[in-house]
Regions:
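S-adenosyl-L-methionine
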Residues: 1-12, 16
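A short, conserved alpha-helix within the catalytic core of class I
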Residues: 31-43, 48-49
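Short SAM/SAH-binding signature in class I
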Residues: 18-27
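Single, function-defining residue in the core of a domain
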Residues: 167-169
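Flexible, glycine/proline-enriched loop segments at strand-loop-helix junctions
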Residues: 26-32, 75
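Conserved beta-strand signature within the Rossmann-like core of class I S-adenosyl-L-methionine
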Residues: 46-62
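Substrate-binding/catalytic lobe of Class I Rossmann-like enzymes that use SAM or dcSAM, i.e.
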Residues: 59, 65-164
Length: 169
């Protein structure tokens, strides 16, 4: 396998003359609520009329698998989640102490989504210029959602958005 210059090999071919394919990788659509996903799909479909959508979707799995994926043994996701507090401190001048918060990932079956939370490990107060907020031990801050889909539910969403469902794998 040698290196190739794919752009150079295209020889200045005109881009945009044919049908468009929109690629939305990973399972990023899961970061939208179902209502937001519907709007996105409608807009994406309109943007590539005559073309195609290639979308990564995370499907519903057993709860243990989903929760383990969002609470990995190495603590990568927990560190990512707690890092929000450092950014809030920097941007808003708060005094969140990262060590005072535990990462929690739970699957809400009724909403078909993983919810990530930060949970206060003890009673504490967070301060900022002109204010403060007390948190009781165990109180949570809901930081992120990741919606999961069954194939029939996602196909129904596509239909609702006016998108013809194609191949799934």
């Amino acid at each position: 396998c040698g290196q190739r210059d794919a752009v150079g090999e295209a020889g200045g071919a005109e881009v945009g003359g044919g049908p468009r394919t929109l690629f939305f990788p990973g399972s990023s659509i899961g970061n939208f609520t179902p209502e937001e996903a519907l709007v996105f799909l409608r807009e994406a479909h309109a943007a590539c009329q005559g073309g195609a959508l290639l979308i990564g979707v995370d499907l519903v799995k057993p709860v243990g698998i989903l929760e383990a994926a969002y609470d990995d043994p190495l603590g990568v996701t927990a560190a990512f989640n707690r890092n929000l507090l450092l950014h809030i401190n920097r941007l808003a001048g708060t005094d969140f102490a990262v060590r005072d918060w535990s990462h929690l990932a739970v699957f809400d079956a009724a909403l078909s989504r993983i919810e990530m939370h930060l949970q206060a490990r003890r009673d504490l107060t967070v301060r900022w210029a002109g204010g403060e907020r007390a948190f009781a031990a165990g109180e949570r801050i809901h930081t992120e959602n990741s919606c999961k889909w069954t194939l029939p539910d996602f196909e129904a969403l596509l239909t609702q958005a006016g998108v013809a469902s194609g191949v799934s794998w």
